[in-house]
């Protein structure tokens, strides 16, 4: 009779181990999905910050274009804030999944030990990217913002800088005597059709990647 009870107890433990293990696998699958979304958003954030750096460099190199570039910077700052907010939400989601996974694993390990089985490996041992420590290390990079270089503090200083830039250009032998200031080179985004800087790799308004409107066409063969 005692043997039957022991066998039934072990069968119940095996059943519970199976159910809890299936639940653990589902959580791990969700963790992987969350991390893929987190990695994708992290990549976008790096692109946004690279675009921000380009805009800041452009602002200092062409003082006369400050107003247009400042508008782009404001849009990009809002985009970065939204991206960081999304990343923080994903990080909180991964924390909750870790909190849900940990007691399940401890319970399964205890049951496995009653059957003489080894403990299951920790998440960090199975896959480094699924560990909570990995996400915490990345957070410091996500919150790093590019430092804006100093700019003229008044419109008078900006105007003086623009005049100096014009004078330097007029001294260049390649410039004609009838030189006049040209507007900043712009192009239309093919996705949202808004005017953006010609060299911008990403539209700051709709986030679409820029591409040429006039790609090279293959040469037509002469008619036989």
Swiss-Prot record:
A zinc finger (C4H2-type) spans 189-206. GO terms for cellular component: cytoplasm; nucleus; postsynaptic membrane. GO terms for biological process: nervous system development; neuromuscular junction development; neuromuscular process controlling balance; neuron development; neuron fate specification; positive regulation of neuron differentiation; spinal cord motor neuron differentiation; swimming behavior. InterPro entries: ZF_C4H2, Znf-C4H2. Residues 208-224 have a biased composition (Basic residues). Disruption phenotype: Larva with TALEN-induced zc4h2 null mutations show abnormally pectoral flexed fins, outward positioning of eyes, continuous swimming movements and balance problems at 5 days post-fertilization (dpf). Also exhibited an open mouth as well as continuous jaw movements. Display a reduction in the number of V2 interneuron precursors in the hindbrain and spinal cord at 24 hours post-fertilization (hpf). Display a reduction in the number of GABAergic interneurons in the midbrain tegmentum at 35 hpf. Disulfide bonds: none annotated. GO terms for molecular function: zinc ion binding. PROSITE patterns: ZF_C4H2 (PS51896). Keywords: Cell membrane, Coiled coil, Cytoplasm, Developmental protein, Differentiation, Membrane, Metal-binding, Nucleus, Postsynaptic cell membrane, Synapse, Zinc, Zinc-finger. It is found in: Nucleus; Cytoplasm; Postsynaptic cell membrane. Residues 166-185, 204-224 are annotated as: Disordered. Residues 12-97 form a coiled coil. Plays a role in GABAergic and V2 interneurons differentiation. Involved in motoneuron development and in neuromuscular junction formation. PANTHER family: ZINC FINGER C4H2 DOMAIN-CONTAINING PROTEIN. This is Zinc finger C4H2 domain-containing protein. It comes from Danio rerio (Zebrafish). The lineage of its organism: Eukaryota, Metazoa, Chordata, Craniata, Vertebrata.
């Amino acid at each position: 009779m005692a043997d039957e009870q022991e066998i039934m107890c072990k069968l119940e433990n095996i059943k519970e181990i199976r159910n809890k293990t299936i639940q653990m696998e589902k959580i791990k699958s969700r963790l992987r999905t969350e991390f893929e979304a987190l990695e994708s958003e992290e990549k976008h954030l790096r692109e946004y910050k690279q675009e921000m750096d380009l805009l800041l460099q452009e602002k200092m190199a062409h003082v006369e274009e400050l107003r247009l570039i400042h508008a782009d910077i404001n849009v990009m700052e809002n985009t970065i804030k939204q991206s960081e907010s999304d990343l923080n939400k994903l990080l909180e989601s991964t924390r909750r999944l870790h909190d849900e996974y940990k007691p399940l694993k401890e319970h399964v390990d205890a049951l496995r030990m009653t059957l003489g089985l080894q403990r299951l490996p920790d998440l960090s041992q199975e896959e480094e990217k699924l560990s909570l420590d990995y996400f915490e290390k990345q957070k410091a990079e996500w919150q790093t913002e590019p430092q804006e270089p100093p700019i003229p503090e008044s419109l008078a200083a900006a105007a003086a800088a623009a005049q100096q830039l014009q004078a330097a250009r007029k001294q260049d032998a390649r410039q004609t005597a009838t030189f006049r200031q040209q507007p900043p080179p712009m192009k239309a985004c093919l996705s949202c059709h808004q005017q953006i800087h010609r060299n911008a790799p990403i539209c700051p308004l709709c986030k679409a990647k820029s591409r040429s409107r006039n790609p090279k066409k293959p040469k037509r063969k002469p008619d036989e």
